[in-house]
């Protein structure tokens, strides 16, 4: 993938507006790849670009870095930003089992629990949240709760909630 980005192998998609997945067009893929290319050219890595981007959370930093690109949830939107949260978890947590942990500039304590419908339902059943909308605010509320139990790594709570939901259908 890095070779694909650094060598502009994605350039064929620039003017291709055909859909390839749901609401995403090849041009959207071009935009994401081109922004990543910019990050590697200017900062040397996506991690360094994220360090240099403003935002209260790492999710907001990614949103700000890719602000005008289709497929990246907008900061003011109602998305739970699950894919962004998952990506950050994979890159930052260093458990060497599920997560890669190759970014050392950030702490697992900065992560937000990736929120999907199952985790949301279990969190509601357990009284962790009363919010009915599975959005980033709900993900933050669940994360804040998990920080009371796992202050250094609130995403550990994601495994517990997800596992409970899977095993107790």
What are these regions (language model features)?
Residues 1-169:
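HhH-family (HhH-GPD) DNA N-glycosylase catalytic core used in base-excision repair
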């Amino acid at each position: 993938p890095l070779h694909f980005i650094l060598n502009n192998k994605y350039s064929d998609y620039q003017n291709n507006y055909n859909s390839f997945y749901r609401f995403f067009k090849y041009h959207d893929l071009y935009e994401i790849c081109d922004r990543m290319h910019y990050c590697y050219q200017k900062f040397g890595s996506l991690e360094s670009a994220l360090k240099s981007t403003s935002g209260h959370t790492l999710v907001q930093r990614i949103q700000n870095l890719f602000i005008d690109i289709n497929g990246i949830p907008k900061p003011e939107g109602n998305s739970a930003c699950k894919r962004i949260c998952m990506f950050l978890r994979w890159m930052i947590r260093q458990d060497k089992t599920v997560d890669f942990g190759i970014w050392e500039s950030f702490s697992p304590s900065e992560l937000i629990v990736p929120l999907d419908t199952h985790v949301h339902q279990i969190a509601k059943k357990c009284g962790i949240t009363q919010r009915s909308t599975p959005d980033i605010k709900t993900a933050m509320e669940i994360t804040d709760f998990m920080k009371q139990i796992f202050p250094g790594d609130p995403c550990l709570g994601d495994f517990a909630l997800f596992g409970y939901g899977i095993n107790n259908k």
